[in-house]
Amino acid sequence: VIPPNPLNELTEATFKKMITGNLSSRVRRRFQKWCKTKRKSFILIVSLPISDNDFVLFGASFESRTSKYPFKFDNKVPQKNKGRKKIGSKEKKSKNGSFKITPVYITRFDKEYRVSRTSQEYDFLNKKVVIVGLGSVGSFVANNLSKMGIAKLLLIDPDFLTVDNISRHYLGIDSVIDNIQKVDALEDRLKKENPDLEIECEGIRFQEIVRKNPNLFHEYDFVFSCVGDTKTNFEINHFFRKIGKTVLYCWLDPYGVGYHNLLVSPPNNGCYMCMNYENGYLVNNRASFAEENQIFEKRLASCYSSFIPYNVIAPSSLANKAIEVYLQYLDGEFSSENRLISEIGSNKQFGKEGFTYSVRYYNCLKNSDLLNVALRTNTSCPECNGDYKVDICKSE
């Protein structure tokens, strides 16, 4: 099929020849049936295959002052001498006349086309993902997954967006003014940007969801945990290991001096709790680039408003890295082991304020291979030893 020459006048005959000669018998019958209804105007869009998996679109608008048949098809059996003119007869002009035809520019907006424009190698069109925690990190993770064509998201967060963290969150000041929960505000924003995305929201704590409906997570393929609370992550770790779901834990160090992704698949060695125990005792996360026993929280507005400083670069960078790890997981790179993947962030303000780096930070500076390591089972870990007995499916 060759598209019409833009330098030549477009006619109904041009389109009729191009279309009817390249349709299957089933589609041709449907097209002929459509043509048997009179119309004053319509737009015809033609799909032209250019490869096995790709096609282009072109089309035209057809307009007439009166209702007419779009194209004329003669399905009658030819009769002998039917086409022979009688002597002295005059040829009758068609009462149908012709349409005014104007070329139109066709722009695709379907999901498959948008995803293909990103050079995406992975098929996200049937993937369903859970995001627990929609703070600065979780909001950017949700946005990235939406842009990449994920099929469905389950968003979990009980909090409202506040002015205190608006400068480092994907959502804007309008979400603060409307005084709605993060899950609802993020759903509204993502649906406006990607109408094809299916979103399920839960504006309550993860623990409450598990107690009320533990089967909610069964249809989902993957979990991002972007919460900043260690105890909640312990419970997330315990629950999803129990039901066999892979979780990617994403967290930031104070001041954005480092950020970390921990991929935990239940069949493999190690878990999130392994990072928080040493010699049988609970300790600060062992992946951290900040030495323990330091106070990083600041208070500006009031005694009730505390925060740990970092700018928007840190959560957006962590979210981008988290998506990269997810892609590697889908590609089978971590099928036999759990993985801790760290990145060194900005250290200017951290050092300026006199904070101390951890031993791991200096070790990673000397040997960058230590930033990406396989997770091993910690003999002190209560979860891996079977000693973690908390059952969040039961009421407190």
Feature map (PLM): residue ranges:
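A short acidic, amphipathic alpha-helical/loop segment
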Residues: 144, 212-213, 234-239
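A short, basic/flexible loop-to-alpha-helix module at the beginning of a structural domain
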Residues: 99-129
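Flexible loop/turn segments at secondary-structure boundaries
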Residues: 137-139, 161-164, 208-210, 231-233, ...
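Glycine-rich phosphate-binding loop and adjoining beta1-alpha1-beta2 segment
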Residues: 158-195
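Glycine-rich adenosine-cofactor-binding loop
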Residues: 117-160
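A structured beta-alpha segment of the ubiquitous adenosine-cofactor-binding alpha/beta core
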Residues: 185-219, 227-230
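Generic, well-ordered alpha-helical scaffold segments in large soluble proteins
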Residues: 140, 144, 148, 186-189, ...
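Glycine-rich phosphate/adenylate-binding loop
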Residues: 1-96, 218-222, 226-396
